[in-house]
């Protein structure tokens, strides 16, 4: 009888220890998730970024084509009309382009009709890298998630007619269609504006 009581006590102790352990793990996960949400909230609220030389750039959120994805766009940038976009870009013309006065710094968004699922983004990124590396210098590439959307990213230097262009490009699936967003500037402006480009590209978020 005594042994039986001891066994029950041991089992009860183990159960209590397991319950306490589970509670601690749950608390840790909740705190971690709260910190993550707080960090994301703070990121969304920051609307200013400085260039390398310290010039403060003020941005505002822009929703593209009434879609439920948003990017921070510098307030000083102007949206180009179709004729200007067509002259500036050869081949696949973006739907929307925001530029500085000199049109040397741009944020371009292509809302394509190409079928693309969320799960295809990884293979599309790899295909793009293979295509681009022949005529461009690939700086880096990445694959990550934003609000459960897979995002492919490629940074590269491409050649234009009389200069070289720094590109920070992301692509993702929205409504099962491919969307491409690119921040670009001439390589002469890359050092000054690269952090601003990162700020713009990394500001992407989706609202359900």
Indicate residue ranges for each PLM-predicted region.
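Short beta-strand micro-motifs in enzyme catalytic cores
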Residues: 60, 94-96, 150-154
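A short acidic-to-branched-hydrophobic micro-motif
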Residues: 94-123
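Envelope-exposed proteins and targeting segments
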Residues: 67-69, 73, 94, 150, ...
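Glycine-centered tight beta-turn/hairpin loop motif at sheet-sheet or coil-to-beta transitions
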Residues: 66-70, 102-104, 160-164, 176
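Short, well-structured beta-strand
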Residues: 147-208
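Extracytoplasmic/secreted envelope proteins and their assembly/folding machinery
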Residues: 74, 121, 125, 129, ...
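Signature of long, low-cysteine stretches enriched in small and polar/charged residues
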Residues: 2, 86, 125-173
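N-terminal targeting sequences that direct proteins away from the cytosol to non-cytosolic compartments
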Residues: 2-93, 184-208
């Amino acid at each position: 009888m005594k042994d039986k009581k001891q066994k029950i006590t041991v089992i009860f102790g183990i159960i209590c220890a397991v319950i306490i352990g589970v509670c601690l793990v749950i608390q840790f996960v909740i705190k971690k998730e709260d910190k993550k949400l707080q960090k994301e909230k703070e990121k969304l609220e920051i609307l200013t970024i400085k260039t390398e030389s310290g010039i403060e750039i003020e941005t505002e959120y822009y929703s593209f084509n009434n879609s439920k994805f948003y990017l921070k766009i510098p307030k000083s940038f102007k949206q180009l009309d179709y004729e200007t976009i067509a002259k500036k870009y050869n081949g696949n013309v973006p739907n929307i382009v925001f530029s500085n006065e000199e049109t040397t710094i741009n944020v371009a968004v292509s809302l394509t009709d190409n079928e693309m699922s969320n799960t295809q983004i990884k293979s599309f990124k790899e295909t793009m890298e293979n295509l681009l590396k022949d005529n461009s210098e690939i700086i880096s590439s990445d694959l990550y998630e934003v609000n459960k959307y897979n995002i492919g990213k490629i940074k590269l230097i491409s050649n234009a007619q009389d200069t070289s262009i720094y590109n920070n490009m992301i692509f993702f699936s929205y409504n099962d269609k491919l969307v491409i967003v690119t921040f670009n500037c001439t390589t002469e402006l890359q050092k000054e504006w690269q952090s601003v480009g990162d700020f713009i590209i990394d500001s992407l978020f989706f609202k359900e």
